[in-house]
Amino acid sequence: MQTYTDSLAHLQDELRRLDSMLRLHFEGAGDGAAASKDGFEGMYISAEDVSRLLEPDREQRTVTNEQLRQQIDDQATRLRDRVSLSYQQGTPIRFAALADSFALSRPELDAVLLALAPELDQKYEQIFAYLLDDITSKRPTVGLILRVLSHTEQERLASLTHFSPSSPLVAHGLVELHPDSPDVPTLSQSVSLDRHIVEYLTGTDDVAGSIADFARLEESPTQATELTLEARTQTRLDSLVSDTVDDPTIYYLHGPSGSGRASAAEAIAASVGLPRLVVDTPRLAGTALDTVLAQLTREAMLKSACLQFENVDALDAQDADG
């Protein structure tokens, strides 16, 4: 079994599995639907179009739903094995890392995949338009996602929690729901993937544009000799980190300018092998702080980084002056 060369190669395999899942849903939906819309003369998506998009090399053969389910299970097993092997060989897979960072279940990760698909291949716009019987629909709805992912009505109803305000998908801003009007039911709302999550999954390493004015990602030194700390201070920090490494911890580093606070922050991050998302705290003044803090937290989780707020004292001074 080969490892993945990169995260994009893995996404291609994920899309093949998605095609099988959509094929299963398509076969179960029957051939009665077709996407058309008054005022869009000449635009029409047929069942044959969808079948060709899902299996362009498919020969004329009968595939049962049970065979499709087995195919999906086999694809999932191969994906897990190749991802595991890739990590062992030193190739991280961003789609898997997203699941780990935000504790996503496989159904939630599949919801991400369905929302991501139109960003990677325009054929999914046509497939979703057909399945929703609306030529203007380019993205999946909550209802369609749940139908594709669920085998029974009970599963479908239970899966609504994946799109509740407290769910990882919504609470961390991974997906966005788009109601046409305030009273549109959740099931009818279209789903898109947050733009920065799309960028991350497709290989971009930049910090999210919404926080780029006041946050930057910095790699931590890999060797203690790269730091300018006294041996006693380094030993104390090592002991402190060792006692708290398994728990989310806030370290407050204080002292006058030049006392080594920045070096201490680098040492803490280096001791756990993580980069730092460094925030210029005074520049947060005047922002919607709750929203910004949520975005910073998401970015730190996405990048597996320590969140470091610098120049906090300057913000206190601004408040005093105000």
Predicted ranges, named:
Residues 1-322:
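Intrinsically disordered, low-complexity N-terminal extensions of AAA+/P-loop NTPases
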